[in-house]
Structure formats: C-alpha cells, structure tokens
Amino acid sequence: MKIKQVHVRASKIKLKETFTIALGTIESADSAIVEIETEEGLVGYGEGGPGIFITGETLAGTLETIELFGQAIIGLNPFNIEKIHEVMDKISAFAPAAKAAIDIACYDLMGQKAQLPLYQLLGGYDNQVITDITLGIDEPNVMAQKAVEKVKLGFDTLKIKVGTGIEADIARVKAIREAVGFDIKLRLDANQAWTPKDAVKAIQALADYQIELVEQPVKRRDLEGLKYVTSQVNTTIMADESCFDAQDALELVKKGTVDVINIKLMKCGGIHEALKINQICETAGIECMIGCMAEETTIGITAAAHLAAAQKNITRADLDATFGLETAPVTGGVSLEAKPLLELGEAAGLGISH
C-alpha cells in the first residue's frame, strides 16, 4: 500500500455558543481536514485543529505545512508511520496539529487495510469511552444552570474552566457544586492562570467540595511550581500544557511533578507520539487522560476516542468538542449529540467518509 495523493481543505464550523477559557474565547472550530488516497483507492481521513492559545499554530499555517508534508510522503506506506514522522520532523520542528492530521489519516488507512476498527489495532482494550463535558468560563449562576442541564443529559463528570481570579473561581465551583450535588464529579482546569501559591490557596479552600482533579494550575514551563502545588494538596494534579510530547512526559515523570498527564493528539502530533507518552506514564504508574482542543471536529475526536478505548492506562476522557458544533465536516465517527458514552462500532479504521 502506497500513498498516491494528499488533499487538504479548511473547515470552519461555528460553535453553538462561544467558549471561554482563561487564555481566550473561541467562536468557531477552524481545522484542516486531510484525505490521503492510496494507489489501491483507499482514503484515510485526518484532522489538524490548531489551538493557537496552546500550540501557537494558525489554520493558514497548518494548511501550508500539511501541503509540504503531503508532497514529501507520496509513495510511502501508511504503515511506515515511524518513517513518515521522520520525514515530517525534517520539514518542521514543531507543527503538532499538522503532523496529527497526517498521522491520523495514516492510522485510518491502517485500520481500513486490516479491515479492523482502529481501537483494535491500537490495543483493543475496549470499544467505548465515557467522556466528561466542559463548562466554559461565565458568571457563577450561569455556569451552575448549565451544569444542571449537562447532568440532565446524563453526564456524571463536569470539567469546569476557571482562571479569572481565585475568588471568582471559588465562587463558580461552589455555585456548581451546590446546584448538582455531590454525586457528580467536578474537574477544574485553570489553563495556566494561577500562581503556585494561589493554586494551593484555591484548592485548599475548595477541599470540602470534593474536586476530583485540577488541570494545569500554573504556567506550563513552571515545573517547580507545578511540583510544589502537587506536593501541597491532596487533590489530584494533572499536567496539560506542560506535556506536549514524550520527552515532556519523561521529564514530568522523572521529577514526580504531577499525578496525571493529559494527552492531546493536536498537542503531541498524533497517535504515534501519544502512544509513546502513554507508555512512559504507564511504566511509571501515572494514569493518563485523553483530551481535545475546542478547534477539533469529528475526525480528531473519533481518533482520540479510539486511542482512549484501546489503552487501559488512559483512564479519563475529555472528548466533548463535537457537542458544541453546529454541523460535522464528514459523515460517520462520533456523534454530535451530547452524551457521555462514545461508542466506536466495528467499521474499519475510523469509520469516516466524505
């Protein structure tokens, strides 16, 4: 099996409502959709959702980089994923969303060629994933009302975006907990907004509110600060922006910096690198979450769900980006309907078509 053509197009899908985090506000899911065609006529689908707040990538830059990658991998076998990543790394030192788009399409082709759903090729641990759902930053009463609505849809785990000041953040969490009760798990994500001391103060102030975990409380490069927070609180601390690739994961693990690591395909460059991160973490006794960018659509979320289902050490999922989309850019894959259970089915590869 050899790659014959690589096509890329821009996809811009309006969100049902704006999504605000500590780093900024997102109004649409802007991503690059890739189709890799083989000489025998198979077509693999990939996606690069460039999260400018996280990776610094733009849609225009991602499209251009994918064009360069596409020209360079013509004639290669999608199964030779190590070689394909070597080719991409020589062209661009970073560009994780662009690399993820090519990577995901190659894995889709592998599944199609093997006539197996992708999760079977990646480990086959399960065929479904349970995801949380995220509440963007808003006034406490508004977030509490939305939390109740999400619980009515069947979600038992809510991820709460915080990061506009610890007093306001504490008020948000208290309002949500009072609205949904204590049977619902609450996760917090500060997106690097707190100082280490403020993080400890906020987490300790919320001790009675049973927070499951706190994600990326401090600046991504402040590993000492991250370790300080982890050492000072009983709540589970998770790295997100501090872990882009396997090298980052190794450093976090060696230093005992956090309790959990969040893997995102758009952060690490695709499934190939994500597997390395998970293997490092599993060896060290560190569980992983699989997360997503708000810019992702059906393809990226479906690929992440297959990886999460396949690997036992990926114990949590935050794969809710499709729930906010007005429409989907492709047919098949995970549903746009907001529901906690993502069922993957038995279609070969990702189960996606144009």
From Swiss-Prot:
Binds 1 Mg(2+) ion per subunit. Its EC number is 5.1.1.-. Mg(2+) binds at D189, E215, D240. GO terms for molecular function: magnesium ion binding; racemase and epimerase activity; racemase and epimerase activity, acting on amino acids and derivatives. It comes from the Bacteria. GO terms for biological process: amino acid catabolic process; peptide metabolic process. Keywords: Isomerase, Magnesium, Metal-binding. Disulfide bonds: none annotated. Substrate binds at T134, K159, I160, K161, N191, K264, C292, M293, A294, E295, D318, L319, D320. Its cofactor is Mg(2+). Catalyzes the epimerization of L-Ile-L-Tyr to L-Ile-D-Tyr (in vitro). Catalyzes the epimerization of dipeptides, with a preference for substrates with a hydrophobic or basic amino acid in the first position, followed by an aromatic residue in the second position. Has epimerase activity with L-Ile-L-Tyr, L-Val-L-Tyr and L-Arg-L-Tyr (in vitro). Part of a large, functionally divergent protein family. Protein modeling and substrate docking was used to predict the substrate specificity, prior to biochemical analysis. Belongs to the mandelate racemase/muconate lactonizing enzyme family. This is Hydrophobic dipeptide epimerase.
